[in-house]
Swiss-Prot record:
Gene Ontology BP terms: innate immune response; protein ubiquitination; regulation of gene expression
Function statement: E3 ubiquitin ligase that plays important roles in the regulation of neuronal apoptosis, selective autophagy or cell proliferation. Stimulates the degradation of kinetochore ZW10 interacting protein ZWINT in a proteasome-dependent manner, leading to negative regulation of cell proliferation. Inhibits autophagic degradation of diverse known targets while contributing to autophagy of midbodies. Autophagy-inhibitory activity involves MCL1, which TRIM17 assembles into complexes with the key autophagy regulator BECN1.
Compartments (UniProt record): Cytoplasm; Lysosome
Enzyme class: transferase
Protein name: E3 ubiquitin-protein ligase TRIM17
Biological source species: Bos taurus (Bovine)
Zinc finger (B box-type) in chain: 94-135
Coarse class of the protein's main subcellular location: cytoplasm
Catalysis performed (reactions): S-ubiquitinyl-[E2 ubiquitin-conjugating enzyme]-L-cysteine + [acceptor protein]-L-lysine = [E2 ubiquitin-conjugating enzyme]-L-cysteine + N(6)-ubiquitinyl-[acceptor protein]-L-lysine
GO CC aspect terms: cytoplasm; lysosome
Length: 475
């Protein structure tokens, strides 16, 4: 007996003749036949309902040989349980070709349900209205479909492989570009570092030369004045001494003394300018600061009643000065001032202000505490919560500190930049036109939140432009 036949025999032995499936909890009747416990009990229950009379109480006919067997004498068949389990775990190829319901060969294919069926299934109500074809025909049809699908998948695989190769090439190209850019950044910053070092040395040398020239002029003037002072002192002593002599002695050689006095008139030295020509300008600094630039907008509710705020994009006034302007607690009443809507308590911030002012128009720019006095005239100093640069007289721009350290400029700035580093406690002012540094406030920390601060002087003194808002005082 070959292996296939042996497997078939085992399947037959492990199959219940009632349910035509492998045994589940098999039991043996007194006549020696085996059935699933549930199958034989259901069969006998059905027989009990159909036949009210039995030849022997508690006995039922065997479904195989019809011999009566007492229901109590059903014995578990443990060996058959193991055989059924083995067959269930290792079905033969032929068993897989059998219908699980009817144990018939699967010779047909249901197109509607897309699964093989047997001849008995074909006649069932479930499959009778369905399109059914021989399984060989279905195999040929689906083989063609599978070939088409496989060909399509092969083409898609080729496309995927090409795309993968392209992406890998792109990745390598990208990494090479990043490498080159990283090296370029290193080189350029190294060059910039050298350039900045050279520029620093150039500025320091220019400043030193300017210092030496001015010091030499001032020292020369000082020496000349000192010499004149000594000559005048000697002549004064001679005159004092002559004044103490007798009248005749005093009048001797009076003409010579008086002529010497006339020749010793003070020679005033030429005025030496102490306006520094060497500008503190770091190349590229303004461009770096612009990376922190923000649109600062003046707050109309804080503006002095006669301070006009005009929004150029919206083409409208943000505030209309009039006698009946509401005077809230945030509005400035002592000076033509306003603060920005922004409140800064951290971070770095940069903004610019355009200056279109006339003559010696007074103004102030910077930051202030959010709780500064707005009703009373107080000095705009850090002690009062103001960190500003303001115009004093002529072209002198004084930081509002005590004592003030005026900065004299050749030309008034038409565009100023303000940089705030809150955590560092630093506020710096720049001429945005040429990038030169004007002044810095440096302290351990600011005492609290800050707001941009803008102040103008008398009417018709000019305008300030902050972002898209123009400020001026109504005349």
């Amino acid at each position: 007996m070959d292996a296939v036949e042996l497997a078939r025999k085992l399947q037959e032995e492990a199959t219940c003749s009632i349910c035509l499936d492998y045994f589940t909890d098999p039991v043996m009747t007194t006549c020696g036949h085996n059935f699933c416990r549930e199958c034989i009990q259901l069969t006998w229950e059905k027989a009990r309902g159909q036949k009210k009379r039995r030849k022997r109480k508690g006995s039922f006919p065997c479904p195989e040989c019809r011999e009566l067997s007492p229901q109590r004498n059903l014995r578990p068949n443990r060996l058959l349980t193991k055989v059924a389990e083995m067959v269930r775990q290792h079905p033969s190829p032929q068993s897989r070709d059998l219908c699980q319901v009817h144990r018939e060969l699967l010779k047909l294919f249901c197109e509607d349900d897309q699964r093989p069926i047997c001849i008995i299934c074909r006649e069932s109500q479930e499959h009778r209205p369905h399109r059914v074809v021989p399984i060989e025909e279905a195999v040929q049809e689906y083989k063609l479909k599978l070939e088409e699908d496989m060909e399509h998948l092969r083409e898609e695989m080729m496309k995927t492989e090409k795309l993968q190769a392209k992406e890998e090439h792109t990745l390598a190209e990208w990494q090479e570009k990043v490498k080159e850019r990283r090296e370029r950044i290193m080189v350029e910053f190294e060059k910039m570092g050298l350039f900045l070092m050279e520029e620093k040395q150039r500025l320091l040398q220019a400043l030193k030369k300017e210092e030496e020239e001015t010091v030499a002029k001032l020292q020369e003037s000082t020496a000349s004045l000192k010499q004149q002072s000594h000559s005048l002192e000697r002549l004064l002593l001679q005159l004092e001494d002559r004044n103490e002599h007798t009248p005749l002695q005093m009048l001797q050689d009076m003409k010579g003394l008086l002529s010497r006095k006339s020749s010793l008139s003070v020679q005033y030295p030429e005025a030496t300018s102490i306006m520094l020509k060497t500008i503190c300008r770091v190349p590229g600094q303004i461009e770096v600061l612009k990376s922190f630039q923000e649109d600062v907008v003046p707050d109309p509710s804080t503006a002095y009643p006669y301070l006009l705020l005009y929004e150029s994009r919206q083409r409208r006034y943000l505030s209309t000065p009039m006698d009946g302007t509401p005077c809230g607690k945030d509005r400035f009443l002592a000076y033509p001032c306003a603060v920005g809507q922004e409140i800064y308590s951290s971070g770095r911030h940069y903004w610019e202000v355009g200056m279109n002012l006339t003559g010696d128009a007074l103004w102030a720019l910077g930051v202030c505490r959010d709780n500064v006095s707005r009703r009373n005239r107080v000095p705009k100093s850090p002690e009062n919560g103001f960190w500003v640069v303001q115009l004093c007289k002529g072209k002198r721009y004084a930081p509002a500190a005590f004592p003030p350290t005026p900065v004299t400029l050749a030309e008034p700035p038409s565009h100023m930049g303000i940089f705030l580093d809150f955590e560092a406690g630093e506020l710096a002012f720049y001429n945005a036109n040429d990038g030169s540094h004007l002044h810095s406030y440096t302290q351990p920390a600011f005492p609290g939140p800050l707001q941009p601060f803008f102040c103008l002087g008398a009417p018709k003194s000019g305008q300030m432009v902050i972002s898209t808002v123009t400020l001026w005082v109504k005349g």
